[in-house]
Amino acid sequence: MSDPVQPDSGTADALLRAVEDQQSALVELAGTLIACRTDSQSEDNPEFPSEAQRCQQIVAAWLSDLGAEVHRWHEPPHYPVVAARLPGSAAGRTLAFNGHVDVVPVGDASAWTHNPWGGEAASGRLWGRGAADMKGGVACALVAMRAIRESGIGLAGDLWAHIVADEEVVGRSTRHLLSRLPAVDAVLVAEPTALSIMPVEGGLVHFRIEIDGRESHAGNRYMSVHAGGLGGHAGVNAIEKMLRVVTALQALERQWGNLRNHPMLPAGFNTIMPGIIAGGPGGGADGKLNIVSNPGTSPNYCSVEYNLWFLPGESFPAIRDEVESLVWAVSQTDPWLREHPPRFTWKLRDIYFPPAETSPEHPFMQSLVAALEKAGQEPRIEAFTAASELAWYAEVGIPGAIFGPGRIAQAHSPDEYVDLDQLHAACSVMALAAAAWCGVASF
């Protein structure tokens, strides 16, 4: 495929005018999406299936009105997916805008001064749950597609919208979408980046370690900790055995931070953080105690759940093997652990994201840089220090970047908002980037 024809100043100006003409529609659409109560993590929100369906119906209707080819289905048990193709002339490169319409719960409603489901525009901001993360970004993508249509520009390559409703629960919609639909040549994930281009993110995995001990009355403890006692026959404290493992993994974390790095990620980003611990007598499994007793019996069960970040260029199997090998080595120095080795559960609750990395020199990155410049914004290329759906595109070899309105600091917080000027700028950049990457077939 030859390089597609790039937009000249005339087509760029036409796109910017078209986006400008859609500003009221942009704010209205984003507010309408915010008004859908799509908090997918809330156990007290039985309305999620119907609200997610309503939200995705708005998305699908918008895209259908553009003349896009719309695909809809549900991921079990109740996550609607909308994928739509704005066809090009088949001579250019293809691009997908990725976004999610599910949000995290409101939390403490008394901490909000704006209605979390109001979608209110006030003081130069759009307020509500999902304004930044990421219904604002979804609205920008949809309005950018309309602006391309309204400008009279015909793209050379197909422009897709991939909109899901299960990102906040680490669902499988995007993964299944990528196996179900034609592959695209690049993706733009519209998460909040405050208009920075973010083509890099680390890998993430959750895992659990479990250790068994032996119960005994606390009055017998002296026999297991002093020379001449009964040792393990007087009880084995699973919490203390776990401390050996926790200490070893903490040392490994420090070693990683000192010896391994990535030029775009903060030093020490690759961490191994213990986040949840459970231990006690009475036994346990899967990170849960069978009973809640008292500390008068030595604990025979302990589990620790970890959040582990690793770097682009590193593989999950290698990281897993390194962690397990270290814990095995520690176990060999302890008679009890040698005979009762720690047990691992990886990808706990399905939490796993592969790393993503697209070179700043990649042509798609250059399309984004050029789009920012044409929109009057200073290009900034940085790393994303959270996990996103970009991971699943990277896993199948699709280059891309995270780019959108809003700040990650606003996400998941009370009085979440997105600046209206960032909404406008992000929409302009998305339209310009699509034209630059897909190419212009006609105008």
Regions found by a protein language model. Give the residues of each.
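Metal-dependent amide/peptide-bond hydrolase catalytic core
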Residues: 1-12, 21, 71-74, 212-443
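Short glycine/proline-enriched loop/turn "hinge" motifs that connect secondary-structure elements
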Residues: 111, 153, 199-203, 295-299, ...
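Short amphipathic alpha-helical segments
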Residues: 80, 124-125, 159, 300-304, ...
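Fold-level recognition of mixed alpha/beta catalytic cores in primary-metabolism enzymes, strongest
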Residues: 132, 136-253, 412-428
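Acidic-glycine-rich active-site phosphate/pyrophosphate-binding loop
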Residues: 106-122, 202-205, 210-213, 217, ...
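Acidic/His- and Gly-rich active-site-bordering loop/insert found
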Residues: 3-127, 150, 154-155, 407
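Short, surface-exposed alpha-helical segments at coil->helix boundaries
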Residues: 49, 53-57, 138, 320, ...
